[in-house]
């Protein structure tokens, strides 16, 4: 070691936050950090900032004009190919939205996460740091009226339109986040472009939708750089399918995107410096500084591939399909040594991006040829070749779906270019077209609910089962629509219980009786009635425990139909394990309590909200199969803090019931008599130090009143997670039911 070399790494910096941390000592520790993200502490905007209002005050078409002008305003520090940045901005928007996956709804462009690591430093995102910097003067001009999340997508739309393509529309409304989202599982590989972990069992690991660490979809050279278009098609079908795209949408997206621009592989990637998150401070957040000749323009290195697909790379055309089928293709390599294909025996006629005197032969990627040599893709490709209007429509729709899949329901769509057509992947619910129930109706309906012959615990469990399908990642699920009565939700194992079908039948009967009795157009939806049943049942449970509470309720939900429900798509919301209902068990890789934290994060819960909900759900006997797991009370159905009192009782000793370590028996320390049974999702609130600290608040002698108040608040939050109609219109005037 030289005299000037430091023997310490920055990880061991002797300042606050340095040195070994808990995750270093205990890497398997429960990841509660994902429940503490994106809060007001990290947000620099004013408290109460309303992005929807800000966006709607924007000079939207002025912004679009500025973006269109930028497309051809080539900058010396990063020159535009063919004098037009369109291809670059299409790629930027695609790679922002394209991280979405259907299994957990995470990823996507809805939070502007491409600005942060790891996405800003993925190998597949080389040079997109430059695209975002090109946008900065426009973002600076319009400030908080346009989020980065919206701007990245809108720039892609304007790029398409500026090159002659008619888009399907655009919806704003994506609010920015201000830190990297730590909840997303991007894979277990420790090397960029690795895939040894995600294919450990022979198939792509769930919930991943990319074939390699750091790629958006697949390796364009072919699987593990095997330039076989047929094998590549298998990877394409899996990855695009996991991003919610069918074969037609997949073909349209690949061909449509590759109608424009070019790839960049002027030299080997060894010439590139560190990625943005690892680069020197002097680069100010830019990365991949190139040492290859000028490093820009014709010398740019991005993917290592060097392909220009069409003769008019800044104009919409059908040339991609024309060339795909017109020419025979032979394998070659780019200047960087990457596998790609060139048209055999064809005189060069493709323009050079910077020198009009130079021409190139047509070239394609391995994954482009998949659209010709995969039998199913070929049928679609030939149809698009022969019917350019069908291709244009399919690409417009697929691009809109790609860029809006994680925005949420249509009520969140903002701006003057929102398309009027309702699409099934938007999980539509009928518009509210009738007067809603008032306070007197609520009081009447609550009495009918509690006198229905169904226990209040079953009614509350029904409401929880409906509302808790929500996931904040892509804003799907929730109580609105009452889809719990429809396929596929009614057939999920967690919902295939007699008490649920009986509760729904009773509520449907009450709904019919009420609606039939009206002399006006006033109606109550089943979706509203399910949530109202939860409120009425919760008030009764609290009252039976000696607490007089009022549970807030806002009517206005409507009932979706089976025709408005994509069964295959909704099946992605079915839980593998759900600790809130003591359903399912962990695996050697994902423990039961890990599944619980994952579910809590999708419900936008904080650690205290998670804790209080578990305590209340257990004493209300919310277990899906009505087992006694975690029901630490002698008075089930009453809203008490008994779960915490008995969990923290040092007179109880816990031991595994068997060698699975999933079920535990709590016995009296002195007599050995069994008192309770618990799952891992129960005992974690006594074993994990941070969760135990919260549990102690609720388990104290003065904790029950706070517990009841906090449980009611947490339920109100969960039951309204999907009420974006209230949040967007400012009509969140909750009707307080009469006591």
From Swiss-Prot:
Annotated crosslink Tryptophyl-tyrosyl-methioninium (Tyr-Met) (with W-94) location: 217-243
Domain of life, source organism: Eukaryota
Chief place where the protein resides: cytoplasm
Cross-link Tryptophyl-tyrosyl-methioninium (Trp-Tyr) (with M-243) placement: 94-217
Post-translational modification: Formation of the three residue Trp-Tyr-Met cross-link is important for the catalase, but not the peroxidase activity of the enzyme.
PROSITE patterns in the cross-refs: PEROXIDASE_1, PEROXIDASE_2, PEROXIDASE_4
Positions of the UniProt region annotated as Disordered: 1-20
Name of the protein in question: Catalase-peroxidase
Lineage: Eukaryota, Fungi, Dikarya, Ascomycota, Pezizomycotina
Gene: katG
